[in-house]
């Protein structure tokens, strides 16, 4: 997609992508007015302090005192710091514009620094601004209203004390920059506080002059606490150095500031720049170069190797690189160029101190004495060899006029410090001898001939004739057309090829001006398309070559001449095919004839000369026609789209304004929605088409309501049977943009507004910083790489976000609109997925694998934004999903260790790699340990507790619980209730106490670890041992007993040690003692003196078993 630079109501150049709209005068007037009135707002905060009257002299004293305190002493001592301050102005204003464009919001604090810098710059430049008002307007340095206010000041009686005001503005700027965020936040209560009326009147009305300085002084005073007031206690600094100050400022502005300003703005085209580095629509057309025109030339200036590493060049880079008027046509075009560490041999023929064009280089644009043009650079230089010795040196009259241009900033514009004499560089002579080398230097440039020059120390270095790549598409006229106020309001596109900026071209052509006016006034797409061809042609007809060249012809015979026609590189020349004898059919000839007019138009737009086109076959000729038509159609489409927001859609955009919400300026689109609905009442098709094109080609990323409005229009059109008709008016490309599901490498907007075949769509952002907007269906959104934004409004359905992006530095966001706040949503976790669900069940967003690596993995969403300005980062989301509710929750620990409390409900708790504390609390809970040494507590209810790899402690609590230790040396406590305990592998300990109920232990393991059963609160004599089949039952009472399942199956099922309060039983031969009395204890359920079952020998048998096994428990 194409980037475009637009100037918005004098606010400055703002880069919008793609084909982005101006925001409209209403919106930006409101915004700029708000900026201007911010000082008024701050003034009102401490209004009570303004009761103290301050005189003008006190104000002067304050300003001078402050300037002295920061080391300026009434003069500019550090130009670099001022230039750095200027950098901040541009950077901060661009950042504010970016925030507004991408989010529709900005914090007032974000513009505080920019405002302060503006006031400082205004103060520093007051003397020179008076003389440069119009120049500053062209540079778009300050907002329109601020410039207007300053101009009114300078044209009023205030001019008599301009230096005083200059001091005040400086001081004001510094104080605004230092102003505290807290106080500023307290003052922002209502957008009505930001009316521009006071300051507008403050500066504009000359009759208020007598009060102005006092008012400004009072304002400054209100910003400063009493204990920091710099002007209390004397008048030592009054009026110091005012004249010197003004003189130094003017000198600084002329010598340092203004050139810097112009250079800065050269990096950002001042006009509606609709060309990327190399537009797609021109690619195939320019590939016809080897088949175009019987005349060609290359740019071949002489260059000198100044640093000893050979002659180096750079590629033609469109507007980002050097632009130079090689042909002396008054048009600077993009060109290959010599690198900054080497130089071009030049001669200032007109003595204006500037290298104006190719005639002042040494090459094929150098005019010789006989009126012809030089064949190459060496031939051009040879004319200066007045003594015929084949060397150019001091013996030749013109030697002293030669200069070497070392283009340090690579802009193609010579500055005084870039032009150096041969003497300065230690060059003694230039040798006219050379060899043809035709060396490819890369970047489209060639070293055609190479010789040498001699230095004053006797050494030699390389000198050569370059063939530089040419790009005539990217061009800038060297002169400017003065526009009237009315002409300056016309729609505009940047000049291209041999065409001036559209607005300037219209000022010079009545036909174009009338056509542009008619086109701008057309109210429907159909009406504009009916005029588009005529508009394109009228602009092309302003080409200075229009009508001067011979009609285009076809040929199979290529003839090479020099110096005229299309600029080709040597590689392009080599591609030409000569002397092919082919005749064309009548059909092909007719197609060529039909394309002639379009070929002439494309020549004007691309700076080419296609007076002759060459072909090798009929297929070749027809392909020329196809490329011509395709290129023209793409050109027309680009012009239409880039004029769209300056013409037909401009009235809608004028309805956008600003509102204040939660201390944040926000774009207010309510008027825009009303405007579309108003049009729809009388012309539904126009409203449908206009809204669709605004969404397809605009940059209103934050206007989510517009997507829903479009979806409503689509549904209504379908019901009315008009949808197919509306789509035909829109065209396939617009429909495809609104229905597309896959992005590109650019910053795409993917949206479900009903143009697709399915209500449920899948959106893929791929590369770039994309915006993916789900509709009412169940959508799948995958952002890909880049900083992506996923947008969800009310009724967003059951959507899935897949956000895998491992790149560093990216920032992915989920944005909830339509007034959705965090309180309206629940945040839960399921496995590694984040589930964001509307409490009214109107939708759910599942962010897949969000919690991989505890939310630091490649799937994370960095921030979740809400309309009220609240932002949730990853850390906050991690806390939210660990909060329990009264329902059944799923809570997960993190790798660093967590404490989870399930609360009420039947909960699921999951440990991780850390040492976790997992409390189920009330309810029938399921608790799963992780890899750490975890503590699991079931609490009330019938719980299931599962250990894992670590040495875990499992406590079932009240209820009939299931405990499984798995791996590790675990401790299992069943607690009250009839519990099931399974230790798993490792040396496990089972704890049994009074009131624990009737528990079952399953202790099977294949390892040889030692397991323990600990009876707390019991002595050895209190517990009776019973064999029940293959199980061992240990009973302390009828209510409290433990059954060890399969104890007598073998060693793998046994508990090795029984620990009591007074002793421990531990013997690997324990089973044989039990077996000796097997017939005595079998089938007994209660210990005691039950002689009917035991023959009166039970206690004796138990004693005989226990006696050898008694050991004293360790202390």
Curated annotation (Swiss-Prot):
Provide the protein's localization: Cell outer membrane; Secreted
The record, for SUPFAM superfamilies, names: beta-Roll (SSF51120)
Question: Hemolysin-type calcium-binding repeats: which residues?
Answer: 755-772, 773-790, 901-918, 919-936, 937-954, 955-972, 973-990
What InterPro entries does the annotation carry? Haemolys_ca-bd, Hemolysin-typ_Ca-bd_CS, Hemolysn_Ca-bd, RTX_toxin/Mannuronan_C5-epim, RTX_toxin_determinant-A, Serralysin-like_metalloprot_C
Keywords on this record? Calcium, Cell outer membrane, Membrane, Repeat, Secreted, Toxin, Virulence
Tell me which positions the record assigns to the signal sequence.
none
Which molecular-function annotation in GO is an example for this chain? toxin activity
Q: Which cysteines bridge via disulfide bonds?
A: none
The membrane topology term of the UniProt record is:
Peripheral membrane protein
- Extract one GO cellular component term from the record: extracellular region
Family the entry assigns: Belongs to the RTX prokaryotic toxin (TC 1.C.11) family.
The text the record gives for the protein's domains is: The Gly-rich region is probably involved in binding calcium, which is required for target cell-binding or cytolytic activity.
Function, as annotated: May participate in the pathogenesis of meningococcal disease.
Q: What is this protein called?
A: Iron-regulated protein FrpA
């Amino acid at each position: 997609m194409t980037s475009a630079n637009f100037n918005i109501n004098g606010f400055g150049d703002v880069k919008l992508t793609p084909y982005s709209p101006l925001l409209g005068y209403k919106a930006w007037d409101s915004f700029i007015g708000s900026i201007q009135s911010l000082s008024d707002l701050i003034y009102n905060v401490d209004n009570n302090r303004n009761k103290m009257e301050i005189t003008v002299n006190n104000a002067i004293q304050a300003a001078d005192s402050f300037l002295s305190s920061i080391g300026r002493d009434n003069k500019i001592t550090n130009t670099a710091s001022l230039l750095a301050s200027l950098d901040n102005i541009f950077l901060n204003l661009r950042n504010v514009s970016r925030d507004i464009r991408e989010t529709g919001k900005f914090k007032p604090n974000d513009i505080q620094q920019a405002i302060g810098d503006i006031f400082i710059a205004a103060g520093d430049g007051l003397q020179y601004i008076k003389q440069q008002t119009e120049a500053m307007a062209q540079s778009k340095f300050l907002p329109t209203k601020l410039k207007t206010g300053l101009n009114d000041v300078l044209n009023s009686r205030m001019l008599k004390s301009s230096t005083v005001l200059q001091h005040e503005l400086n001081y004001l700027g510094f104080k605004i920059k230092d102003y505290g965020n807290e106080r500023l936040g307290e003052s922002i209560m209502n957008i009505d506080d930001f009316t521009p009326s006071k300051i507008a009147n403050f500066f504009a009305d000359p009759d208020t002059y007598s009060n102005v300085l006092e008012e400004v002084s009072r304002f400054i005073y209100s910003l400063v606490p009493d204990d920091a007031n710099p002007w209390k206690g004397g008048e030592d600094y009054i009026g110091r150095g005012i004249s010197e100050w003004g003189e130094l400022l003017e000198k600084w502005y002329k010598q340092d500031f203004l050139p810097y300003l112009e250079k800065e703005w050269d990096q950002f085209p001042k006009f509606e720049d609709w060309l990327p580095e190399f537009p797609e629509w021109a690619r195939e057309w320019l590939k016809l170069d080897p088949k175009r025109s019987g005349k060609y030339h290359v740019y071949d200036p002489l260059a000198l190797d100044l640093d000893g590493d050979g002659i180096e060049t750079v590629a033609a880079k469109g507007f980002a690189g050097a632009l130079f008027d090689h042909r002396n046509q008054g048009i600077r075009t993009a060109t290959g160029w010599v690198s900054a560490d080497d130089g071009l041999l030049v001669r200032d023929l007109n003595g204006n101190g500037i290298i104006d064009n190719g005639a002042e280089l040494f090459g094929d644009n150098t005019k010789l004495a006989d009126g012809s043009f030089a064949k190459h650079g060496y031939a051009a230089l040879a004319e200066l060899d007045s003594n015929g010795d084949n060397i150019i040196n001091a013996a030749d009259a013109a030697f002293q006029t030669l200069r070497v241009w070392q283009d340090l900033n690579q802009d193609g514009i010579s500055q005084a410090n870039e032009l150096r004499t041969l003497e300065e560089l230690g060059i003694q002579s230039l040798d006219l001898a050379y060899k043809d080398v035709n060396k490819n230097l890369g970047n489209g440039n060639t070293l055609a001939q190479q010789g040498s020059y001699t230095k004053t120390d006797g050494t030699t270095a390389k000198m050569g004739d370059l063939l530089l790549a040419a790009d005539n598409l990217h061009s800038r006229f060297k002169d400017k057309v003065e526009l009237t106020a009315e002409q300056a309001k016309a729609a505009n596109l940047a000049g291209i090829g041999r065409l001036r900026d559209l607005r300037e071209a219209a000022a010079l052509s009545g036909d174009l001006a009338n056509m542009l006016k008619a086109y701008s006034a057309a109210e429907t797409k159909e009406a504009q398309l009916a005029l588009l061809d005529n508009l394109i042609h009228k602009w092309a007809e302003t080409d200075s070559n229009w009508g001067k060249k011979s009609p285009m012809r076809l040929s199979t015979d290529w003839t090479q001449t020099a110096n005229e026609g299309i600029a080709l590189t040597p590689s392009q020349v080599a591609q030409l095919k000569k002397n092919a004898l082919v005749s064309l059919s009548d059909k092909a000839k007719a197609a060529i004839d039909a394309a002639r007019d379009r070929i002439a138009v494309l020549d004007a737009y691309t700076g080419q000369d296609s007076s002759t086109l060459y072909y090798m076959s009929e297929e070749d000729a027809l392909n020329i026609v196809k490329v011509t038509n395709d290129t023209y159609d793409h050109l027309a489409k680009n012009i239409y789209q880039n004029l769209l927001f300056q013409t037909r859609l401009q009235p809608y955009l004028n309805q956008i304004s600003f509102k204040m919400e939660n201390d944040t300026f926000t774009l207010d689109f309510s008027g825009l929605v009303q405007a579309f609905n108003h049009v729809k009442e009388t012309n539904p098709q126009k409203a449908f088409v206009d809204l669709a094109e605004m969404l397809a080609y605009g940059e209103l990323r934050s206007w989510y309501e517009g997507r829903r409005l479009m979806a409503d229009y689509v549904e209504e059109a379908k019901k009315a049977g008009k949808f197919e008709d509306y789509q035909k008016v829109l065209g396939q490309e617009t429909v495809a943009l609104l229905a597309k599901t896959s992005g590109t490498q650019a910053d795409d907007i993917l949206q479900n507004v009903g143009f697709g075949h399915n209500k449920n769509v899948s959106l893929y952002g791929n590369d770039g910083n994309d915006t993916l907007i789900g509709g009412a269906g169940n959508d799948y959104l995958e952002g890909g790489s880049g900083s992506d934004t996923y947008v969800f409004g009310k009724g967003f359905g059951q959507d899935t976000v897949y956000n895998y992006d491992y790149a560093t530095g990216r920032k992915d966001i989920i944005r909830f609109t339509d007034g959705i706040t965090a309180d309206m949503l629940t945040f839960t976790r399921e496995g590694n997925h984040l589930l964001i669900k509307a409490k009214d069940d109107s939708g759910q967003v599942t962010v897949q694998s969000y919690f991989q690596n505890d939310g630091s993995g490649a799937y994370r969403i960095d921030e979740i934004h809400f309309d009220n300005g609240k932002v949730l980062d990853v850390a906050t989301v991690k806390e939210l999903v660990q909060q329990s509710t009264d329902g059944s929750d799923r809570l997960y620990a993190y790798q660093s260790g967590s404490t989870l409390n399930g609360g009420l409900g039947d909960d699921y708790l999951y440990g991780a790699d850390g040492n976790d504390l997992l409390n189920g609390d009330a309810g029938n809970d399921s608790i799963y340990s992780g890899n750490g040494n975890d503590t699991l507590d079931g609490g009330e209810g019938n719980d299931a507790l599962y250990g894992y790899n670590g040495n875990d402690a499992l406590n079932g609590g009240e209820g009939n619980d299931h405990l499984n230790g798995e791996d590790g040396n675990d401790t299992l406590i069943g607690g009250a209730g009839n519990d099931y305990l399974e230790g798993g592998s490792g040396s496990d300990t089972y704890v049994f106490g009074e009131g624990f109920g009737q528990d079952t232990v399953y202790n099977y393991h294949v390892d040889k670890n030692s397991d323990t059963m600990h009876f707390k609160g019991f002595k050895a004599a209190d517990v009776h041992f019973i064999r029940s089949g293959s199980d061992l039952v240990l009973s302390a009472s009828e209510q409290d007993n433990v059954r060890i399942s399969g104890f007598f199956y073998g060693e793998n099922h046994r508990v090795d040690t029984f620990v009591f309060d007074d002793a421990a039983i531990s013997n690997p031969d324990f089973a044989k003692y039990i077996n000796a009395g097997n017939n005595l204890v079998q089938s007994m359920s209660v210990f005691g003196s039950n002689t009917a079952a035991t023959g009166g020998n039970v206690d004796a048998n138990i004693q005989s078993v226990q006696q050898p096994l008694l050991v004293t428990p360790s202390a």
